From Swiss-Prot:
Species of the source: Chelativorans sp. (strain BNC1)
PANTHER family on file: GLUTAMYL-TRNA(GLN) AMIDOTRANSFERASE SUBUNIT A, TRANSAMIDASE
Gene name tied to this protein: gatA
Catalytic reaction(s) noted: L-glutamyl-tRNA(Gln) + L-glutamine + ATP + H2O = L-glutaminyl-tRNA(Gln) + L-glutamate + ADP + phosphate + H(+)
Protein name: Glutamyl-tRNA(Gln) amidotransferase subunit A
Quaternary structure (record): Heterotrimer of A, B and C subunits.
Length: 493
């Protein structure tokens, strides 16, 4: 049964078609794996075993009748940010206690329409605010990876830490995730999984709990590049319920895998060589450059001059949007309600008890930068910086660059309750230093495993592409995947 959970989505599809096992047997194997591992890893907050069995039986019926859909019988984990009809959805926040939506998010609707099976809801940073999955009301997720010879619990990254940990520990065949400033790509890099943040507007945001509406984008975390391509094809769509989703055809991403990269121009931005970057990250980046060169790509040095302003601008724009989006949680119609003497006190009590420390910090920052005396000085200036960042990328692509290669993170995974990180929020925010520019510009970015550090922990590389050109990212990421090889954690859970 263990071997079934190690299959990739492409392998699952082939073996289900050949009747080597049933969708129900596969689902039972995953449910058994979750039961064994979840107490230690804390990746799932809700396991929908009965629903999963029901969906798997329906898939078996279709497989028997010869009407298999693209994800028929494939068991997936769903980040707790996606509304799932009748299934507890609370963005891992106390303030949404016992909330069961009466509707389904567009992304999950698309996945179920393609035959996928829901195993349950995955842990995450509260309201997707965090880079370590330590802000969840349900407690931290534990990374399946450990230092060579060590037994210290490490973070899986965030905010999609549950998604990355579940995929890496073989607790689902793939997972949905979201990325506002790096929340797909950083956890993927920390767990040796593949994560793609598609172009803003590629996937509908309808039914996804909002953090920062102009930055949020859904995407998959998967075992390999091919699986990520398969999942994104099903997740992506135009949606009349989300006016920011773009009405352009969704290509067959899987077809891009294996295509030659000969003649492609890969840009190397000098601004990503940040001060204090570990030598191992620098060496891995050079290795990635050589792999692309060996595959026939042309390497060109480029400049993205406004990169250094991206992180401070992001931490103005994102909290500003969050403070507005999170104003709707007041204890009146759903979720946690803490009584007070009057309605104002009830609002105050509910929000004080319901939101965690990091969420409160960001709401306060956002409210501050939007306030009358500071709006021009902070928020408008940050939006101008955002325009300049977008223009930097446009100029690079106009000059003929096809994709940009950078490190995915400034370090490997760090320890849970790391004192340095907890003492200084800015140090935690620096985890997003290589990823936020992509969200600010609305571009696609993919993180792919590329090696291990001296302690045996995974490191990833990031590829950034033109808007709506995810195909080139899958094509180039596959080259890195082929050159670097596969990385799996040693089972300790």
């Amino acid at each position: 049964m263990t071997e079934l959970t190690k299959l990739t989505i492409s392998e699952i599809r082939a073996k289900l078609a050949d009747k080597e096992f049933t969708a129900l047997e596969l689902t039972e194997a995953y449910l058994s794996a979750i039961q064994t591992a979840n107490e230690k890893l804390n990746a799932y907050i809700t396991v929908t075993a009965d629903k999963a069995r029901e969906m798997a039986k329906a898939s078996d019926m279709r497989l028997m009748q010869g009407g298999a859909r693209p994800l028929e019988g494939v068991p997936l984990g769903i980040k707790d940010l996606f509304a799932t009809e009748g299934v507890h959805t609370q963005a891992c926040s106390h303030i949404l206690d016992a909330f069961k939506p009466r509707y389904e998010s567009t992304v999950t609707t698309n996945l179920w329409a393609d035959g996928a099976v829901m195993l349950g809801k995955l842990n995450m940073d509260e309201f997707a605010m965090g880079s370590s999955n330590e802000t969840s009301y349900y407690g931290p997720v534990v990374n399946p990876w450990r230092e060579e010879g060590g037994n210290k619990d490490l973070v899986p990254g965030g905010s999609s830490g549950g998604s990355a940990a579940a995929v890496a520990a073989w607790l689902c065949a793939g997972a949905t995730a979201t990325d506002t400033g790096g929340s797909i790509r950083q956890p993927a890099a920390f767990t040796a999984t593949v994560g793609i943040k598609p172009t803003y507007g590629r996937c509908s945001r309808w039914g996804i709990v909002a953090f920062a509406s102009s930055l949020d984008q859904a995407g998959p975390i998967a075992r390999d590049v091919r699986d990520a391509a398969i999942l994104l094809k099903s997740m992506a769509s135009v949606d009349p319920k989300d006016t920011t989703s773009i009405d352009i055809p969704v290509p067959d991403y899987e077809a891009a895998i294996g295509q030659s990269v000969k003649g492609l121009k890969i840009g190397i931005p000098k601004e990503y060589r940040v001060e204090g970057m570990p030598a191992e990250i620098e060496a891995l980046w050079h290795k990635g450059i050589e792999w692309m060169r060996d595959a026939g790509a042309e390497i060109v040095d480029i400049s993205l001059p406004h990169t250094k302003y991206a992180l401070p601008a992001y931490y103005i724009v994102a909290p500003a949007e969050a403070s507005s989006n999170l104003a709707r949680y007041d204890g009146v119609r759903y979720g946690l309600r803490v009584p007070g003497r009057d309605i104002t006190e009830m609002y105050e009590n509910s929000r004080a008890a319901g939101f965690g420390r990091e969420v409160k910090r960001r709401i306060m920052i956002g409210t501050y930068v939007l306030s009358a005396g500071y709006y021009d000085a902070y928020y408008l200036r940050a939006q101008r910086v955002r325009t300049l960042i977008k223009r930097d990328f446009e100029q690079a692509f106009e000059a003929g660059v096809d994709a940009i290669l950078t490190p995915a993170t400034p370090s490997a995974a760090f320890g849970i309750a790391d004192q340095e990180m907890n003492a200084d929020p800015v140090k935690m925010y620096l985890n997003d230093i290589f990823t936020v520019t992509v969200n600010m510009a609305g571009l696609p970015g993919i993180a792919v495993p590329a090696g291990l550090d001296s302690r045996g922990l995974p490191l990833g590389l990031q590829l950034i592409g033109r808007a709506f050109d995810e195909e080139t990212l899958f094509r180039t990421a596959h080259i890195i995947e082929q050159a670097a090889g596969k990385f799996e954690p040693k089972r300790w859970w």
